[in-house]
């Protein structure tokens, strides 16, 4: 496997793990008995098909959870101001396209680490103020694939500043932009 392929694979894997972690933090069950907390991507797609859920409602739910939990967890560095518009577009496509013609990630909100380039209104800073406001020339390869699959880029997840490419004595999970993040698994066990 080439280093570019390996890098893209590991970026995609970390994005998937972020989605799973975010889903595991949620504890809301919709009136129909559908639990977002325990939902897989397949469950979410089934809820979309059964009209139990829309991408807009899912994005609104995640944005609310980020608003509630992020001041403590500090896991999300920035949310995409266009996420709701992307969700509306996904809902419209779901209404007009043939069932089964959309990808499994269509309409699913996903966070990407802040060192993965997105050519949109989000910053790509690797957690550093030094890159705040810089403009990337294009989406990273993994983001191109996610967008093509219909995923909604919900925002940027924090990471150790410069993706931990600095002093080995620096604490993990710290960045100038994001502050010190918390270990989510431990917090979940304590709640």
Model-derived segments and their meaning:
Residues 105-191:
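Short glycine/serine-rich loop/turn segments
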Residues 86, 93, 161:
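Acidic-residue sensor for enzyme active/binding pockets
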Residues 74, 88-92, 172-173, 179:
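Alpha-helix boundary/capping detector
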Residues 54-55, 101-103, 140:
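Secondary-structure junction/capping motif
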Residues 45, 100, 143-144:
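Short glycine-/small-residue-rich flexible loop motifs, especially phosphate/cofactor-binding loops
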Residues 90-109:
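Immediate post-signal peptide segment of exported/extracytoplasmic ligand-binding proteins
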Residues 2-89:
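An N-terminal boundary/leader segment
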């Amino acid at each position: 496997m080439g280093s570019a392929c390996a890098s893209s694979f590991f970026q995609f894997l970390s994005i998937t793990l972020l989605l799973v972690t975010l889903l595991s933090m949620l504890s809301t069950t919709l009136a129909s008995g559908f639990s977002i907390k325990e939902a897989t991507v397949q469950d979410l797609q089934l809820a979309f098909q059964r009209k139990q859920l829309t991408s807009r409602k899912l994005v609104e739910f995640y944005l609310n959870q980020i608003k509630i939990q992020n001041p403590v967890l500090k896991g999300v560095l920035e949310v995409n101001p266009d996420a709701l518009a992307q969700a509306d577009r996904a809902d419209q496509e779901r209404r007009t396209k043939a069932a089964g013609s959309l990808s499994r990630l269509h309409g699913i909100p996903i966070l990407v680490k802040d060192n993965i380039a997105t050519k949109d209104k989000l910053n790509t800073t690797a957690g550093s103020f030094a890159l705040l406001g810089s403009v990337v020339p294009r989406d990273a390869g993994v983001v191109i694939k996610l967008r093509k699959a219909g995923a909604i880029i919900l925002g940027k997840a924090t990471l150790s500043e410069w993706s931990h490419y600095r002093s080995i004595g620096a604490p993990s999970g710290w960045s100038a932009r994001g502050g010190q993040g918390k270990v989510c698994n431990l917090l979940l066990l304590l709640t």
